[in-house]
Amino acid sequence: MDNDYTTSTTTSRRPRFWGFFFILFPLVSFLMWTIGLIVLLGLWSTQDKWHTPSEPDPVYLSDMGAYTKGFFIPMCVITGVFYFLTFIMIRLARQWGWIYPTGRKVETYLGWFAALTGAAAASCLISLSIRDDVHHDNVHWKFTAAFVVLAFVSAASNIFEWLSATRYYPQSSLLRVSFIFKFVIIVVGIICAIAFGGLHHNYRGRSARFEWVVCFLWSIYICLLCLDLAPALFYDSLASAPDLEKGAYATSVPESYVAPMEPPAAVLPDGEERYATPDLVPDTTAQYPYASATEPGVSNIPETRPERPVVYNMDVSQTTTTTRPVLA
């Protein structure tokens, strides 16, 4: 296994402030995008819904952005920049061991590819907000299509990276929940994006609804990125947490690892005992006088033993035989 993380177990504890700093990036992106969508929907609803026979019901988000560029452009800029920085923070946090340390080289490649495509998606989001569909209709929808594709590619890279991480952290319920929800969101989002593009010319009202659904699904996905960086907040309980056991302080050995106990002594057929380590050998000097108490395993039996006496020319006649009486 290719390890990108150190195996030192003496890493000092990090301050809680840095955990909030990391999670701040996806949180700002999520709040800015979600609040912006709600504000634009509220403006459309309070302004008589801009409902005319030629406009879809509800109106396209792009149309709302074209008439509220003073709000729509900062909304897209803040969302896009912090969305890109979120992937940078995730990759750095994994390399530094603040969250799940990297287990394979492919995770590093997927993480940086997600950051690269996230930067491209953020650029397209900012560009489509500037080139609105009222004055630059063709260019605007090209940027919109590029943004949707790049955002899904970035999300797919992040999902595959998390899928690879679940192999080394199967005990992490947080990691597993994040992966499952992201996978469901990206599948539903792709279906809605296809419906949005397919209904754009003939059924504009339905197409606009799918556009709003895709936007809110992307908002939920950004919220899940906050969940990915949440372990950085719990540095005190990280070593003993059951779902982050392996990656506590950038170590490859779980902090709760307990060495196995020595196996019990095995009883041999001749009655002797064989112990796994010399430290477990009991003091049997009194029972076995030839055993050494200071050096286990060393015998004090003399090298030359006295020979047994041998009797030659035994006179069989000297032996006596006792006859037991036979009862009649």
UniProtKB/Swiss-Prot annotation:
A GO CC annotation given for this chain: plasma membrane
GO biological processes: lipid metabolic process
Membrane-spanning ranges: 20-40, 70-90, 110-130, 143-163, 179-199, 214-234
Segments on the Cytoplasmic face: 1-19, 91-109, 164-178, 235-328
UniProt KW keywords: Cell membrane, Lipid biosynthesis, Lipid metabolism, Membrane, Transmembrane, Transmembrane helix
Top-level taxon: Eukaryota
Record topological domains on the Extracellular side: 41-69, 131-142, 200-213
Subcellular locations according to the entry: Cell membrane
Topology relative to the membrane: Multi-pass membrane protein
Matches recorded under InterPro entries: DRAM/TMEM150_Autophagy_Mod, Frag1/DRAM/Sfk1
Function, as annotated: May control the production of phosphatidylinositol 4-phosphate (PI4P).
UniProt similarity note: Belongs to the SFK1 family.
Protein name in the entry: Protein sfk1
